[in-house]
């Protein structure tokens, strides 16, 4: 039986594709191998002593609408923040709150604003952007900010950078902020230490830079 010439051509083409695919398979397998990247190490939190008269606590997004959906906020941040807020109030620090306007009535009771506290309605993750936060803090002689809240890979980092470019020294207690995953949280800490006046060694209270601390390592004097 004689086959059409076109059939013979298609057979040759199919064979070429088959063997070509077989030869290419090792290269594809190699390319598909998972590459493991080493996570950046988070430095040990630093012990710091702060002057209550020139230090302010800035609270970001500790609100029901967010924390109800975020286990790390409910289970890690709030338990650390509750006793710390009591100490902040007792020491007489200036306290400022920043969230979107629709969330201002949703602050968690553990960190709820007092009548005299500063409040800003933000439209961006950086709470200094398009608000009077800087003006109100400087009017009170504030030089150092403790920034807490949701989340380290978002508003906390953006606000910390906004603070540094406005000449504030920033302290971030690692137990009062987080993100949805451990990976995102670790990257957030790495990024904030690399931002602005970088402080990769986590030098305590490096001027106009971020220091990572922890609530039990912060004293007021």
Residue ranges and their predicted role:
Residues 1-9:
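Bacterial N-terminal signal peptides that target proteins for export
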Residues 8-18:
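Bacterial N-terminal signal peptides
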Residues 18-24:
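Sec/Tat signal peptide C-region and signal peptidase I cleavage site
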Residues 25-56, 83, 102-221:
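Active-site-adjacent betaalpha module
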Residues 53, 70-88, 93-97:
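A short alpha/beta connector and helix-capping loop motif
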Residues 57-69:
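Acidic/histidine-rich, surface-exposed loop or edge segments in extracytoplasmic proteins
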Residues 66-73, 146:
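Surface-exposed cleft-lining segments at the edges of enzyme active sites
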């Amino acid at each position: 039986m004689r086959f059409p010439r076109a059939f013979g051509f298609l057979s040759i083409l199919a064979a070429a594709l088959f063997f070509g695919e077989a030869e290419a398979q090792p290269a594809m397998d190699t390319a598909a191998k998972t590459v493991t990247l080493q996570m950046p190490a988070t430095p040990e939190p630093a012990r710091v002593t702060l002057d209550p008269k020139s230090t302010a606590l800035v609270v970001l997004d500790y609100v029901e609408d967010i924390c109800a959906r975020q286990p790390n906020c409910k289970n890690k941040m709030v338990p650390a923040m509750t006793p710390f807020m009591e100490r902040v109030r007792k020491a007489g620090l200036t306290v400022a709150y920043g969230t979107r306007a629709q969330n201002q009535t949703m602050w968690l009771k553990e960190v709820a604003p007092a009548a005299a506290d500063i409040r800003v309605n933000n439209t961006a993750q950086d709470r200094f952007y398009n608000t009077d936060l800087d003006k109100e803090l400087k009017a009170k002689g504030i030089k150092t900010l403790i920034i807490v809240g949701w989340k380290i890979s978002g508003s906390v980092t953006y606000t910390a950078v906004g603070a540094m470019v406005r000449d504030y020294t920033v302290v971030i207690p690692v137990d009062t902020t987080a993100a949805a995953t451990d990976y995102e949280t670790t990257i957030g800490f790495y990024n904030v230490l690399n931002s602005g006046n970088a402080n990769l060694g986590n030098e305590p209270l490096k001027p106009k830079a971020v220091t990572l601390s922890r609530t039990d390592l912060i004293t007021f004097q």
